[in-house]
Every structure is written in structure tokens, then in C-alpha cells.
Regions:
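Active-site helical microenvironments for divalent-metal-assisted chemistry
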Residues: 1-164
Length: 165
């Protein structure tokens, strides 16, 4: 990730992707309150990732928008999952905490974001371990798989959002 001032083209790209997301998300929302929660999630994530770019040079916020679009269009999840998809990298990559998300977006969305953060931690730890000892690697992979399956026990949406990620 890198930081650099967004250009007019960057803002136009963000607006187009956001409009595309909202077009897909509105039918999944039962009322205007749910729509506004998606809007609030986007605005919060957009501000948290302001002027942050991916290695490709693209504005970082495009990634969470794309994940949210997959969550709604290909998996068919509802507004809480859309919000969690938009917010999933805020806790991982900024100074915000799960508690901040809970205070702003409620327990359920915070729980989804927390689950996504925990899965990322498990997967990142596995990547760092390397393949020095095959049996310990297999044991570590089995343990990580078990942790991911336990996440399913909390809320299957966490794994579905992670698949979209």
C-alpha cells in the first residue's frame, strides 16, 4: 500500500464503482434504514482508506467495494454482509478497532468484521510459517482449518465474505 493524493480520475472510478454497488445492494435492503447503513459503511471505509493505493496504483477503497459487490451479486447476502465487506480492511489496515466498528455499526456487523480479521490472522500466520517440517506444517494447516471451521459455528457469512475477498 502507498499514499498519494487521489486524482479526478480516481474519484470518478470510486464514484462509478460505488454507484454500481448501490444499484446491486438496494434490492437486498428491506428499507431505507438498511440502505443508509450501507452508505454509512462506504463513507466510513472510504474516509479510512483516503489517498491509500494498492500496489497496482488503484485507490484502495476499490477492493472493499468489489468484495461487497461479489457478496451481494454472486453470493446474495444482505446489507449486514455488504457493510462488513466494505469495512473488512478498516480494522486490518488502519488505526480503527473492532470496538470502533461496534460503536458505529452495531454488534452484528462488528462481529462479522472481527471474524474476517481473525481468519486473515490465521491465514497470514500460516503463510509465515513456511514448509520447514512437513509434519508440523500439516499439523499447523489442520489447526488453522479447524479454527476457520469454528468461525462457521459463529456465522457462516464470515467465510462467505472471506471467499469473496
Amino acid at each position: 500500500m502507498s499514499f498519494s493524493e487521489f486524482t479526478k480520475n480516481d474519484y470518478a472510478l470510486i464514484d462509478n464503482e460505488y454507484d454500481s454497488l448501490m444499484k446491486a445492494a438496494r434490492p437486498r435492503c428491506r428499507d431505507e434504514e438498511e440502505v443508509q447503513m450501507v452508505v454509512k459503511s462506504f463513507e466510513f471505509a472510504n474516509q479510512a482508506h483516503k489517498n491509500v493505493r494498492r500496489r497496482s496504483g488503484e485507490p484502495y477503497i476499490i477492493h472493499p467495494i468489489e468484495v461487497a459487490k461479489i457478496v451481494v451479486t454472486e453470493i446474495g447476502l444482505g446489507y449486514k454482509s455488504i457493510c462488513a465487506a466494505l469495512l473488512h480492511d478498516v480494522v486490518e489496515d488502519t488505526g480503527y478497532t473492532v470496538e470502533d466498528i461496534r460503536n458505529l455499526f452495531g454488534d452484528k456487523i462488528a462481529s462479522l468484521v472481527d471474524g474476517l480479521t481473525k481468519i486473515k490472522t490465521v491465514l497470514d500466520n500460516e503463510d509465515r510459517k513456511g514448509n520447514n517440517n512437513m509434519s508440523s506444517t500439516e499439523s499447523m494447516q489442520a489447526e488453522n482449518f479447524k479454527r476457520i471451521l469454528l468461525t462457521l459455528n459463529d456465522d457462516v457469512r464470515v467465510v462467505l465474505i472471506k471467499l469473496a475477498d
